[in-house]
Amino acid sequence: MAGERIDVQAIARELGIARATMHRWFRTRELLLGEVLAELGEQRIAILRERVGGHGALALLDAFDAFNRELAGAEGLRALLASEHELALRLLTSSAGVVQPRMVAAVQRLIEAEQRAGFETALAPDLLAYAIVRLAEAFLYNDAVAGVKGDTQRLRQIEAALLGLDPA
């Protein structure tokens, strides 16, 4: 996403397929965007988890923090939020959409992998994953009113506490 409006017809042309084929595959522009964002998010968080190495709560925190910082600095995502705010929030934060459920599942898989390696948490992995994703959504996308939008440092502190680490 280079900061331009996403044109499904142009994407279909670039892929050498008919617009009708794109429509059959994804039905709507919103679903196409959701699939792209979800796939990128799943891949990126897995890559970052692998990159930080280590095990346990600190490894999870470092992976989540790296992911959050990338999102906070993603120009294409910022452009989408600025130009199509309602659509972007619906895509990114709706439990009925594509992105949020898949990101919760991706975070849950990371937590469960750490649990198999000995990490213990007071919360069930699905609940912890949901809380981590929803907090990131609030801090990164839609809490400018509370003055926390883009504040990845405070987000890290809260995620640390959820993971059982000292938030300081």
Protein language model regions, located:
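Short, flexible helix-adjacent loops and helix caps
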Residues: 3-4, 49, 53, 76, ...
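Helix-turn-helix
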Residues: 2-31, 35
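Generic hydrophobic, amphipathic alpha-helix propensity
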Residues: 11, 36-40, 44-48, 107
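Short, hydrophobic secondary-structure boundary micro-motifs
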Residues: 78-83, 89-91, 119-123, 148
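Hydrophobic/aromatic-rich alpha-helical bundle segments in the mid-to-C-terminal region
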Residues: 115-160
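Helical hydrophobic small-molecule/effector-binding pocket
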Residues: 61-83, 97-98, 108, 146
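Amphipathic alpha-helical packing segments from all-alpha helical-bundle domains
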Residues: 89-117, 126-133
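Hydrophobic alpha-helical connector segments
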Residues: 35, 48-77, 128-132
